[in-house]
Amino acid sequence: MTSTLPNASTPDPSSLQPAVRPGAHGRFGRFGGQYVPETLMPALAELEQAAAQAWNDPAFTDELNRLLKNYVGRATPLYEAERLTAHYRRADGGPRIWLKREDLNHTGAHKINNALGQALLALRMGKKRIIAETGAGQHGVATATVCARFGLECVIYMGAEDMRRQALNVFRMRLLGATVQPVTAGTATLKDATSEAIRDWVTNVETTHYILGSVAGPHPYPMLVRDFHAVIGEESKQQCQEAFGRLPDVLMACVGGGSNAMGLFHPFVQDMSVRLIGVEAAGDGVASGRHAATITEGRAGVLHGAMSLLLQDGDGQVMEAHSISAGLDYPGVGPEHSYLREIGRAEYAAVTDQQALDALRLVSELEGIIPALETAHAFAWLEQLCPTLADGTEVVINCSGRGDKDVNTVAEKLGDQL
């Protein structure tokens, strides 16, 4: 069901322009909102209030920044990918490619930025039990990590199929003390894990905080997760000035739910000279029907508490998504991405499983960096993008995670033996 929010603006740490704040009903244009049971409305209001107070409390922001530096390892480097740049260079020049190295964070991906921030909020709210959903396992690992750090009970919901694909991350979560709860319903992937996590939250809302892992879900989650990840773009903006003396021309990131992309894009949304490109999973090809290209192929609908673009059949039922990447295997997307697409501020493309595999291998061989399969989707779009870019174009790709977790999947698909 839908509920309205008080007509009060929420203090925002990123000094946003009004055009990119969610409105009084938690909406980005027509997207977003709160489509949840009444049971959850007090918890969402409590979370929104706690976040607003926390961002205005120097003790909270100082602690967050201290942990981001000393525990997570920020700031992450902006790395010039010289051999990848040379690979795409033409006779008349070509773009210069930079990688924002989120793969170098503690736990190996961007997910720790949000998990850490929300864990601090949970402590502030007196919640001692944490639940989360995970697809590729990186958000689950990040959540289990911060729960271990702060002594919080941790339950991770993960689709049984994703547990098979990401067995290494399942072991990591358990090693960190988390309970990993298999979800066998539906396709046994991220959508189903999210649904089960929400059911748990409804039942245990008084004692439990749900650390949602993407810029999806009911308000205030899309804004909250975005703001904890905005450090990616804020650092990138400063690092670009230091590296080449101006803003980049193109920002690019993979998009499943969309948190790593929104973290990179958000501080640049008002800089209209900067192109924002999100890359989705085309799976076996969009025409095959087996894909997760939500923005490029979806229609507006409601899933997991918010209105956004979704993969739907002719009757409006949410369709099964497919991707070789467990982290992109989701039939929805964060509402702010849907909004940025609708107003023309961001562009979205889709690449197939095979294109992502080819890109993963290329980046590994040229740069000595094995990216996650999710991240490889962004790299794959360089094949189409680079021939269209003028000489000297500065391109920043968010290297959102490392590919250790995907080695077995890649070996299986490429026919290699480890």
From Swiss-Prot:
Cofactor(s) the protein needs: pyridoxal 5'-phosphate
NCBIfam families assigned: trpB
Enzyme class per UniProt: lyase
This protein's GO CC annotations: cytoplasm
Function: The beta subunit is responsible for the synthesis of L-tryptophan from indole and L-serine.
Protein name, UniProt field: Tryptophan synthase beta chain
EC number: 4.2.1.20
Homology family: Belongs to the TrpB family.
Pathway(s) of this molecule: Amino-acid biosynthesis; L-tryptophan biosynthesis; L-tryptophan from chorismate: step 5/5
Record's compositionally biased regions (Polar residues): 1-17
Coiled-coil intervals, chain numbering: none
HAMAP family given in the database record: Trp_synth_beta
Catalytic activity entry: (1S,2R)-1-C-(indol-3-yl)glycerol 3-phosphate + L-serine = D-glyceraldehyde 3-phosphate + L-tryptophan + H2O
InterPro entries in the record: Trp_synth_b_CS (IPR006653), Trp_synth_beta (IPR006654), Trp_synth_beta/beta-like (IPR023026), TrpB-like_PALP (IPR001926), TrpB-like_PALP_sf (IPR036052)
Modified residues (N6-(pyridoxal phosphate)lysine): K111
Oligomeric and partner information: Tetramer of two alpha and two beta chains.
SUPFAM superfamilies the UniProt entry points to: Tryptophan synthase beta subunit-like PLP-dependent enzymes
GO molecular function: tryptophan synthase activity
4Fe-4S as UniProt keyword: no
Positions of region (Disordered): 1-23
Keywords, sorted A to Z: Amino-acid biosynthesis, Aromatic amino acid biosynthesis, Lyase, Pyridoxal phosphate, Tryptophan biosynthesis
